Amino acid sequence: MKNKDYPLRSSMDELSTKNDNEIDLEKGPLPEYNSEDESTLPPYSEIWKYIKTVSEDSSTGPTETTNPNVERRQEFKDSHPNIYSLLRLLISVLAVIVVFFTAWVCVNPLEKSIFGKVAFFVTIGITCPILLITIFCFFETWTQAVAQCIKVTVIFLAQCVKVTAVGLYNSREKWVVIIWLLWVVICYTLFLRSKFGNLNLNKALICSTCSISAALLLFLLYVRLPFWTLKHMFSGLFQVLGVQSCVVIVTKGLTYLFDKHIDATGYEIEASSLFVIGNFLFFYEMECPGALKRMPKFIRNGIASFLEGIGNIGRAFRGANDNNDIPLGEMEVESEV
């Protein structure tokens, strides 16, 4: 009986062997892989591809982000070199003039002795040309520095205002009202002092400032994150100022028509009206948040209701007149029916 030798390798093993023997034309033959060296990886493995990608990215280095303002300035400089040089010279001269007049106002050499005047003009005569040359030569550097300084300052102040407003509003709503009440008391005290005391201040200016400050404090109502937007703040501000403008127009007209019969000046009436309206709108918004945003809709609905009421009254009068025009015989026939 013959012993049949069955192969120990399966069809899958043969397929893998066939694939291993084939050479990829793009990658080339597989190099020998030393498994004893732990730092060596198969060249076509996924980890090797990832490491190669990371090394290529790190070798190229970080890409520098260009400022669009710098690009526009460079384009303008390349296209109009003469105009750009004149602008640099003009701005440099203006900066030197500002420095000169500032030093003149601070020192005031006309009140000094002859030696002081000579020292001042010699110092200015040496400093101003050096400053002009420095500003002109390093124009781009110091303009970028000044722009960056202004930007950082504005952002810092805006963040301070926002953080303060958020802290005030999130602490408790009643504290905001208490602070505003104290402010009203101070303004009202100034108003009384200017009217009956020896404080020589314009009453209209004081009360108008108080009412406008009410509009400015409305931004505390719109600081509830994430609804912090300038749109909400300015909408409340313009609505308050719009109502106050209407009050000013009405009071101006009344004082012009009835000036002889009103025992007060137009400025006092205007100031008092602005003062009352500003405080009323502030507290109304505090009690009903979003009331100022809904105010135009309420005004439109109120005007529509008023006009509709007038129309109903007119129709009622017309109906009554129509009934009065009915002949007496027709009324008797209708009553019999």
Swiss-Prot record:
GO BP, sorted A to Z: meiotic drive; protein localization to vacuole
Transmembrane parts of this sequence: 89-109, 119-139, 149-169, 176-196, 210-230, 234-254
Entry's family note: Belongs to the WTF family.
Region span, Disordered: 1-40
Basic and acidic residues bias: start-end ranges: 1-29
Any single Pfam family the record assigns to this protein: WTF
Record keywords: Cytoplasm, Endoplasmic reticulum, Membrane, Toxin, Transmembrane, Transmembrane helix, Vacuole
Knockout-associated phenotype: Sensitises cells to wtf4-encoded poison.
Keyword Endoplasmic reticulum: yes
Gene of this entry: wtf4
Protein name in UniProt: Meiotic driver wtf4
Listed GO CC annotations: ascus epiplasm; cytoplasm; endoplasmic reticulum membrane; membrane; perinuclear endoplasmic reticulum; vacuolar membrane; vacuole
Family annotation (InterPro entries): WTF (IPR004982)
Known function: Promotes unequal transmission of alleles from the parental zygote to progeny spores by acting as poison/antidote system where the poison and antidote proteins are produced from the same locus; the poison component is trans-acting and targets all spores within an ascus whereas the antidote component is spore-specific, leading to poisoning of all progeny that do not inherit the allele.
UniProt subunit comment: Homomer. Forms protein aggregates. The two isoforms can interact with each other and with themselves. High sequence similarity is required for their interaction.
Species: Schizosaccharomyces kambucha
